[in-house]
Amino acid sequence: VKEAKSNWTDFSPTKQDVAAAGIDSSFNSTKFQGAELWAVTAVSVKSDGEILVDLHEHGLDSNPELASLASKMEIDACQESVDKADLVLMDGSLYSQFLTRQKPLANSLVNTITKKNNVVFISKTSNTKKQFEDLGAIAGDIFYYNHATVSPGFSKIHEDTKFGNDMIISSVFARLAESLPLIKIELLGSGYADNDFKLILNKILN
């Protein structure tokens, strides 16, 4: 907790008006005569309520890979959104995209993100144990920042190279206002500075 406190930068974001788009997906299925009737949707919605992308798939299969299909559709929605918004917010973690997706999908995602460098991954939960493992930490990183801080701000930038040099994940834990729950913000690439994350916090403050 002491280490987490020393890694924390106090920062109160100032709202900056940008055209942001949020992307999320959902899926559902029900058993039907020995098969599964399923549906998957992915949407991209701008902060003013305009729907940029609305994708739907459905079918009848014996063993549909719905989570993978939902992820693919999120990437499709992201591809269609990067040119139409200043900032594209992906719900969830970049780790899960790289860990559970096939190589072609990961490559497609990397190409989409690097096109405009305006894609940000935001998650409300995190199981990563990267920052304090050399201190014998047993809980996830987010646990220590939650206990060490209540002020708005963000943690020291952490760069993870486990997926290779073209898939480096840079992340911080952040709090937008005092006593709010932490969120995790992930960007693709390396070499980011504190100011880069301050700009993002200003843009996502609503």
Question: How would you label these PLM feature ranges?
Answer:
Residues 1-13, 18, 50, 66-206:
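Long, contiguous domain-sized segments
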Residues 20-23:
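Short hydrophobic beta-strand that contains or immediately precedes a catalytic carboxylate
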